[in-house]
Amino acid sequence: MEGDQETNVYTLVARKPSFDLPTACPNCLPAYIYLKLAQLPFELAFNSTFPDSDELPYFESDTYVAYNNEDGGVIEKLKKDGIVNLDSQLQSLSDYLSLKALIVSWLEEALTYEIWVGTEGISTSKIYYSDLPWVISKVLFYKQTYLAKNRLGITKENAEQREKQIYKRASEAYEALSTRLGEQKFLFEDRPSSLDAFLLSHILFIIQALPVTSVLRCKLLEHSNLVRYAEKLKSEFLEASSSSPSPPLHSFPSSFPRKSSKPKSKPKVEKTEEEKKFKKRARFFLAAQFLAVVIYVSVMGGGSSDELEYEDEDD
């Protein structure tokens, strides 16, 4: 496998950077950090074609592709397929399983809640929708908020109770992780693991992407050793390795041909009548796409409008 790693070109395709993070996507950042902790050379490419796709991030090399929505996510797929496995000697430990439950279950649940509900989606535009027209971005935001509430089991009747439960679990998870970590470099003494990738991603995203009014952010900052842990690993593995970054790639879904990262410059050519007609049709297509999204959300949501508007009714 080591010989293959020296010859293969690996690419992680993620959502674009923002908030001084290499990728602002909370699903993409753990995969990026995992590869950095493993010191596996790879290129970072960005895909904004499908802003709400659950396939992102994905990892590819030649004909091999690991998608986020398959086999437990990119990191689990890379471990399973023997590409890179930081947890090979840890997965049987009881501590590993209990910490994974805290990080991948409770903290991931809390972050999902905070992004879409707790902070009312303040950060989501920069992460997912900044390249889209305002109206379409709003429609997709309401759709994703509805889906997030469904995943978290939030209804109009139990919203307050679920909020308290989610924040309580997050507080307990931070307390347990802070105690476990102490002043160690990694969660498991002197070696990085996938759990470090998830935890470091969680901490960096909360501190750098969420507003200062975030409840989850305030709870995290109560544990100074968790913040120091993140600062040290960020400095060693993220900032040091990005001192001479490779030029960014523009990536398309793996079934599409990828453009060269350095296209040749072409002289500006006057648009023909046919090109002008095509551009006009594209505008109509965009409008039709928007209407399709609205109809889809209306049909899919059914009762979702009640859930999204119940706060206004209480007012």
UniProtKB/Swiss-Prot annotation:
UniProt modified residues of type N-acetylmethionine: 1
Alphabetical list of InterPro entries matching this protein: Glutathione-S-Trfase_C_sf (IPR036282), Metaxin1/3 (IPR017410), Metaxin_GST (IPR033468), Mito_Protein_Transport_Metaxin (IPR050931), Thioredoxin-like_fold (IPR012336)
Record bears the keyword Chloroplast: no
Keywords assigned: Acetylation, Coiled coil, Membrane, Mitochondrion, Mitochondrion inner membrane, Mitochondrion outer membrane, Transmembrane, Transmembrane helix
Pfam short name (any one): GST_N_4
Subunit structure: Part of a high molecular weight complex that is distinct from the TOM complex. Interacts with a variety of mitochondrial precursor proteins.
Name of the molecule in the record: Mitochondrial outer membrane import complex protein METAXIN
